């Protein structure tokens, strides 16, 4: 089930500008490190994708708090759709500056779609344009980061051969989108908190790194794939442990329900 927020501005301890800097700087640094360093370090692309996922999840949290309803999953998928277009355009024309050009193109696409949503469709969400720019840019960085994990490079030819032509882009689309859209959907409620939502985004993005780590074995070898998977598992364990601790902090009670009763016991 998906739902929107309470119909107002989302509050949080982490400022929007800080998370934006984390997403843009962390995302680009991770992508470039994964590109320039030896294949064994392609996991840096995944770490960049994690930074971008946290930024995107916070942007979804802010815009969905105005009441998107079932649009919460849709906006996550839209982010990755815009991301694919911007990423391929940037890599095709930008060369070594491809990821930066891709982010610029994503911002333009996001701004146009946000304006259409407010001015034409009439959604009336005050931060829609800005949120769509952020979500589009975050989605682009997630696409690029996870592609670097698989291909070991953001070279356009390598991405086409190792990510697009073999269909791995569909895998990235789903797991990348889930990291951006799912955290707010899962944590939604009167006790939703920014730190719990964002640590869930880290956990989901770590799963994406693990999955793309498996996919990287086809092109980068088992050793590199093993490193990617190991790094993803470590980040996942730390994030999941923190998420569970925050659940216990925010919940009224955490109890074990035991096994479901049998039909005979219910009679």
Curated annotation (Swiss-Prot):
Reaction(s) catalysed by this chain's protein: 5-methyl-5,6,7,8-tetrahydromethanopterin + coenzyme M + 2 Na(+)(in) = 5,6,7,8-tetrahydromethanopterin + methyl-coenzyme M + 2 Na(+)(out)
Key word Cell membrane present: yes
GO function term, MF aspect, one: tetrahydromethanopterin S-methyltransferase activity
The organism's place on the tree of life at top rank: Archaea
Pfam families assigned to the protein according to its UniProt record, in alphabetical order: MtrC (PF04211)
Segments passing through the bilayer: 19-39, 40-60, 75-95, 96-116, 140-160, 164-184, 198-218, 221-241
GO biological process: methanogenesis, from carbon dioxide; methylation; one-carbon metabolic process
Membrane topology summary: Multi-pass membrane protein
Protein localization: Cell membrane
Keyword Translocase: yes
Gene Ontology cellular-component annotations: plasma membrane
Enzyme Commission number(s): 7.2.1.4
UniProt keywords, alphabetically: Cell membrane, Membrane, Methanogenesis, Methyltransferase, One-carbon metabolism, Transferase, Translocase, Transmembrane, Transmembrane helix
Pathway membership: One-carbon metabolism; methanogenesis from CO(2); methyl-coenzyme M from 5,10-methylene-5,6,7,8-tetrahydromethanopterin: step 2/2
Quaternary structure (record): The complex is composed of 8 subunits; MtrA, MtrB, MtrC, MtrD, MtrE, MtrF, MtrG and MtrH.
Similarity comment: Belongs to the MtrC family.
Function comment: Part of a complex that catalyzes the formation of methyl-coenzyme M and tetrahydromethanopterin from coenzyme M and methyl-tetrahydromethanopterin. This is an energy-conserving, sodium-ion translocating step.
Name assigned to this protein: Tetrahydromethanopterin S-methyltransferase subunit C
């Amino acid at each position: 089930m998906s739902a929107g927020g309470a119909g107002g501005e989302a509050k949080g301890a982490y400022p929007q500008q800080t998370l934006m800097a984390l997403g843009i700087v962390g995302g680009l640094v991770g992508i470039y490190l994964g590109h320039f360093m030896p294949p064994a370090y392609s996991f840096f692309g995944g770490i960049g994708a994690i930074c971008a996922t946290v930024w995107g999840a916070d942007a979804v949290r802010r815009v969905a708090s105005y009441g998107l309803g079932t649009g919460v999953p849709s906006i996550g998928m839209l982010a990755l759709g815009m991301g694919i277009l911007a990423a391929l355009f940037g890599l095709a024309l930008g060369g070594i500056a491809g990821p930066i050009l891709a982010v610029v193109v994503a911002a333009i696409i996001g701004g146009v779609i946000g304006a259409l949503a407010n001015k034409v469709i009439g959604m009336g969400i005050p931060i829609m344009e800005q949120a769509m720019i952020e979500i589009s840019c975050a989605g682009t960085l997630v696409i690029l980061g996870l592609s670097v994990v698989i291909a070991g490079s953001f070279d356009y030819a390598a991405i086409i051969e190792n990510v697009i032509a073999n269909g791995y882009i569909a895998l990235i689309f789903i797991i990348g989108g889930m990291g951006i859209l799912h955290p707010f959907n899962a944590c939604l409620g009167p006790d939703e908190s920014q730190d719990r939502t964002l640590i869930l985004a880290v956990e989901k993005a770590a799963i994406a790194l693990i999955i793309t780590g498996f996919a990287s074995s086809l092109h980068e070898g088992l050793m590199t794939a093993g490193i990617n998977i190991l790094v993803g598992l470590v980040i996942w364990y730390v994030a999941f442990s923190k998420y569970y601790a925050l659940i216990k902090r925010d919940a009224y009670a955490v109890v074990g329900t035991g096994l479901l009763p049998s039909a005979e016991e219910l009679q």
